[in-house]
Amino acid sequence: MEGGAMRGMFTCGVIDVMQEAGITFDGAIGVSAGAVLGCNYKSEQIGRAYRYTRQYCKDYRYGSMKSFRKTGNAYDVDFCYHEIPEKLDVFDKEAFKANPMIFYAVATDVVTGKAVYHKCSDGEREDIEWLR
């Protein structure tokens, strides 16, 4: 699934339609926003990515220059990768684990410039770090 911030919202719509139609895959790969939003495909949480993006898009912690000035990141890491999925709009780790679909998050190795693929298996802390 493609990265690219708001392009990811298009991906969310496609994912939701595929889930509603019962379309499944043996595996999926997401990069950047595609990984962050695409993990909801494996956890089978239809509408979740769109829902929390709509709900928190005006919250400076979700993404803003104010967040960048305060934290050094455009997206407040604690808010986006811990508070939302753990408390505000809970990510279903059990469904993620139970789904046999293989899911990889891809990132760029800053030393070699090559793609590094991480197999996300349980939606726990290490997987979340790769998604961000």
What is each residue range found by the language model?
Residues E2-K87, Y117-R132:
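Patatin-like phospholipase
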Residues D16-M18, D89, F103, V111:
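Preference for short coil/turn "hinge" residues that link or interrupt alpha-helices
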Residues G63-S64, A95, G113:
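Short, solvent-exposed coil/turn linker segments
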Residues L88-I102:
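A short alpha-helix-loop-beta-strand transition element characteristic
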Residues D92, K114, L131:
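Glycine-rich, flexible loop/turn motifs
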Residues P100-A115, S121:
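Internal, conserved structured core segments that host functional sites
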